[in-house]
Amino acid sequence: MSKKALGVHSEAGKLHKVMVCSPGLAHLRLTPNNCDELLFDDVIWVSQAKRDHFDFMTKMRERGIEVVEMHNLLEETVRDPQALKWILDRKITPNSVGLGLQGEVRSFIEGLEPRRIAEFLIGGVSGADLAKHKDSEAAKMFNAYLGESSFIFPPLPNTQFTRDTTCWIYGGVTLNPMYWPARRQETLLTSAIYKFHPDFAGEQFEIWYGDPDQDHGAATLEGGDVMPIGNGTVLIGMGERTSHQAIGQVARALFAKGAAQRVVVAGLGKSRAAMHLDTVFSFCDRDLVTIFPEVANSIVPFSLRPDESRPGGIDVRREDKSFLDVVAESLNLPKLRVVETGGDAYEAEREQWDDGNNVVCLEPGVVVGYDRNTYTNTLLRKAGVEVITISASELGRGRGGGHCMTCPIIRDPIDY
């Protein structure tokens, strides 16, 4: 376990510990018929995706980063009977699997080895899985009506994008209520890891927002929109998947503990290509960002600051500067260095779609990005950034790059 305290204090400081999730059973269950509802654009070649993801983990480890993988964390978590009970009490309910199958599904999961439990919690349980375990009348009826390939509870292939389900902001974490139903069960699993796993249980950290036992309604939050950039400031995108209802509550919690003095809200349009702030804007160095200008230059910035005289204890102001200028000013910088998506208009649009601006910073001036974004990678290198590349051919089919596929847990501050 890392000796440094849990917490993320910048976007570009030295990364010490990060959580990722390798492709697995959930991805083996993607088909042309179900991938759209599971938020993937296509099926993937899973064995190749696993090799590419292992290469991603290896390249981070070569930089001295502790990389923890979600299947492994979950396996170690469910070895604790109390942790397994906590998960199953919330995941296998009459509302989720039905009264007739509740006991059988629970019996099936409890009868597995911890590694297989982790695989099925992420990979889902099908009618065929249950039939192999116990060919009961309830299972027969389910399979006769819906078919053995139907899911009693569905796979969670988007766990590959660990950035979104929880996000560490300074000395605490949010347990994010996700926008799409296909992703909402992911947060339960990461919450269990933080509650029971030895790396986290007993450690001191705040829960800024979120509770898997609550229905948050319209107050949705996803980590791809959240960036603790340092100097007491947090950037939060407000677009397709993160709502103002959630942003206000996160800001209030941060202000109440003095963890932040300002939240800069980035008003985004709602689109699949720009589903999160980090798909059009990410840090590559202490003062350098890469952006997709077509979207980033149209962001409407607002600033939230603590003010007990205002409704909810928050002062909300629309900024009269551009988003990039507001970010620079919040970090006491005269200006940000900016690398735009590379190529002509067609090439830039393709590279943004392929996560050219969605890079993860390992330390100041060192990022990991996809190999296929050659124009943008070349511009970053010309700006002095070391770009470590990984294969995009399979990992990118869920629309997420290096930033999306990482949940930083310990990251150093940067002195601004």
Curated annotation (Swiss-Prot):
Report which superkingdom the organism of origin falls in. Answer: Bacteria
Molecular functions per Gene Ontology: arginine deiminase activity
Give the main EC class.
Answer: hydrolase
Instruction: Spell out the subcellular localization from the entry.
Output: Cytoplasm
Q: What is its EC number?
A: 3.5.3.6
So what family is this one in? Belongs to the arginine deiminase family.
Q: What's this protein's name?
A: Arginine deiminase
